[in-house]
Amino acid sequence: MSQQVIIFDTTLRDGEQALQASLSVKEKLQIALALERMGVDVMEVGFPVSSPGDFESVQTIARQVKNSRVCALARCVEKDIDVAAESLKVAEAFRIHTFIATSPMHIATKLRSTLDEVIERAVYMVKRARNYTDDVEFSCEDAGRTPIADLARVVEAAINAGATTINIPDTVGYTLPFEFSNIISGLYERVPNIDKAVISVHTHDDLGMAVGNALAAVQAGARQVEGTLNGIGERAGNCALEEVIMAIKLRQNLMNVHTRINHQEIWRTSQTVSQICNMPIPANKAVVGSGAFAHSSGIHQDGVLKNRENYEIMTPESIGLNQVQLNLTSRSGRAAVKHRMEEMGYHENDYNLDDLYDAFLKLADKKGQVFDYDLEALAFINKQQEEPEHFRLEYFSVQSGSNAMATASVKLACGEEIKAEAANGNGPVDAVYQAINRITDYDIELVKYQLGAKGHGKNALGQVDIVVSYNGRHFHGVGLTTDIVESSARAMINVLNNIWRAGEVEKELQRKAQNKEHNQETV
């Protein structure tokens, strides 16, 4: 009988560590809801003790996600576990994930401890976590470089202490599939109480082995796989969950396991993560890359035309990537747009129909026909703009030429006030940015400017993603229109609003902290 492999997504924890700019609470929630819709069993959404912002993100997601188990990370430290529990207590169901290093190198040089002390601390912290929940995961950091006898001792002790999931990470992506398989099978041979816990694996891609190691571990008995969408993560990244999921689906006859993932949501969830995290998907990326179903060889094209299965082991439709349709114009009504969004898998709470339809009409007037990928892009921008905006672009104009310095005039709404400025620059985008900087007077540094296209040919939308540095923090902004200069301006306005909102959040957190201190003093 086929057994279930639990899918544990850590895009919002391990994956976010690779980003140049931290995600906002709203952005994290948007990804979490997409993961829930895709059907992940467990989502690790943050490290609450690390910052007030991370605590708020975990708490917000824990409150709103209903169909996936929400998990938070904690070191084997009392405060970490207590704070994680506090952030998660509003969830329908939650898990605390605690970890400590077990390899000789980490124990000696990082922890400056001994294996016996590590086991003692792991046992104590697992028991502490069990005071808050009966779902506790324990990870042996750097398990891939831990002698199997030592690893077995730690695992047995953690299970006896109450851990219900034991995670075996290849933290530095060092092992090869046959080695990793031997580690898992070795634990099954050496740990007498191993049947009392789910064995999980968490693999990294430093040698390009993350997916191979995960699948080898499943064959050896692991029943939970941890990873991220699109494989994002520190260094070379994490195990790409979409690849593991589709490998299990397509080779189920060989592996005799299954997942509960809604495969039709894979492509859209992948795109959501890519857009929000500002991490483009390589064209040759397995499963979700733009070239995954493209055939350029004449022999291959001929074979596909005769029978798709000649060269396609899966269909675009199997991951929710349907054919582009050209059925929407400026004459299409609100109901038609709503119906098309529903056909693409969107729900009413995924976007504001009034705002989306207004944006659709403006785009349709410019382009004539609106494609599915246009609607996807508009829905993404629509979601980003749901948060309150302090800055709003009212108007801009640019003059430039091959032998003339670019000049830009910009008018912004700044709260209740309208301000305008003009500036010169090294090109139209720089001129617009100089004018915006004069109005807002934020001391920011542009760290990254990235221009991409949404769609195909001359009717593609221009997407601009930027990252700026402000007060030691990085902030991300995105703009999407048919005009790349306007997209650039809107990306900068998006960044400025993100900076402003971050400041408002900090003020609110300070106010709450002061009120808490005041209440304690008066007790």
UniProtKB/Swiss-Prot annotation:
It catalyses: 3-methyl-2-oxobutanoate + acetyl-CoA + H2O = (2S)-2-isopropylmalate + CoA + H(+). Its main location: cytoplasm. Belongs to the alpha-IPM synthase/homocitrate synthase family. LeuA type 1 subfamily. Homodimer. Its EC number is 2.3.3.13. NCBIfam families: leuA_bact (TIGR00973), PRK00915.1-1 (NF002084), PRK00915.1-3 (NF002086). Mn(2+) binds at residues 14, 202, 204, 238. One of its GO terms (cellular component) is cytosol. HAMAP family: LeuA_type1. This is 2-isopropylmalate synthase. It is found in: Cytoplasm. Residues 392-523 are annotated as: Regulatory domain. GO terms for biological process: L-leucine biosynthetic process. Keywords: Amino-acid biosynthesis, Branched-chain amino acid biosynthesis, Cytoplasm, Leucine biosynthesis, Manganese, Metal-binding, Transferase. The keyword Glycoprotein does not apply. Pathway: Amino-acid biosynthesis; L-leucine biosynthesis; L-leucine from 3-methyl-2-oxobutanoate: step 1/4. Its cofactor is Mn(2+). Pfam families: HCS_D2 (PF22617), HMGL-like (PF00682), LeuA_dimer (PF08502). It comes from Cronobacter sakazakii (strain ATCC BAA-894).
